Design a protein with these regions (language model features):
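Bacterial N-terminal signal peptides that target proteins for export
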Residues: 2-11
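Short linear motifs embedded in intrinsically disordered, proline/glycine-rich low-complexity segments
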Residues: 11, 23-262
Length: 262
């Protein structure tokens, strides 16, 4: 179980970039980058839903993750009425990240939109990349029944955890048969938090694919109750995942649902 990391700070403003800005000029490395992007986009649109025109980007991650961001996808290919919140670019050919931001300052307007961001960039020791993995080797999904802001707060927390704090979620999930995280802040209130179980995607969800630069797996974060959190500590994350999959909850997040243990 990961406790809430107080070193992770949230920047509340997001900005959007048109998808066309993701394209690059065509030298050898950039051709590979674009081929990975195109293959991943095709997989998402075949198995989840059409990607929006705009990608959400956290200002402090601009330079660290220039070709990545977060998508809010109407998940019609999974089930109408569902929304998939997803990282998009952890499996890019220029990942893992080799720099980290420090002394970030972001200015917002009255509507909470970003006006400007300044940061100092420092090189960091790169993560040893597996030859079989595409970038970090995974993308993170949260599936919900609503188009809301709180899942984006969670996605930003995930971005900070992976890109800045260098936490290898995939390795932890594989080592522990899943990963529970408690009290992740997803709103302005002190008690506006969620607990999640992070596990590999289970069928009938798409599990992953082989991209031109290696394997991509999907990790899915599912909101769980306090009771389920404590039960998983005693009985195992894999046991909780099985109970979720055997129930109507599966890997879909609903902050208002009752515990499956009742």
């Amino acid at each position: 179980m990961i406790k809430k990391n107080k070193l992770i700070k949230f920047l509340l403003g997001f900005t959007t970039l048109a998808s066309s800005t993701m394209s690059m000029s065509k030298n050898t490395e950039e051709i590979e980058w674009q081929s990975v992007y195109n293959a991943r986009q095709a997989f998402y649109e075949t198995n989840i839903g059409k990607l929006p025109d705009d990608i959400m980007k956290a200002p402090h991650l601009f330079a660290v993750w220039p070709g990545g961001g977060f998508y809010v996808i109407p998940a019609d290919k999974i089930k109408k009425g569902l929304w998939v919140y997803s990282t998009f670019g952890l499996t890019n050919s220029d990942m893992p990240a080799t720099i980290t931001p420090t002394n970030t300052e972001t200015e917002y307007n009255q509507q909470g939109r970003v006006i400007s961001t300044t940061t100092t960039l420092q090189k960091k020791k790169p993560i040893i990349q597996s030859s079989t993995k595409a970038g970090y080797g995974y993308e993170v999904l949260l599936i919900a029944k609503e188009d809301a802001e709180w899942p984006l707060r969670f996605m930003q927390w995930v971005g900070n955890l992976i890109l800045i704090n260098d936490v290898d979620l995939l390795s932890r999930v594989e080592k522990n048969n899943g990963l529970t995280v408690e009290a992740i802040p997803v709103g302005d209130g002190e008690n506006d938090t969620i607990n999640v179980l992070i596990a590999k995607a289970q069928k009938p969800l798409p599990i992953g694919m082989k991209l031109p630069n290696g394997n991509m797996q999907f990790l899915v974060a599912t909101v769980i109750t306090d009771e389920e959190m404590q039960w998983s500590i005693a009985n195992g994350r894999d046991a909780l995942l099985k109970k979720l999959m055997d129930s109507n909850t599966t890997q879909i997040s609903d902050r208002d649902r009752q515990s499956i243990l009742k």
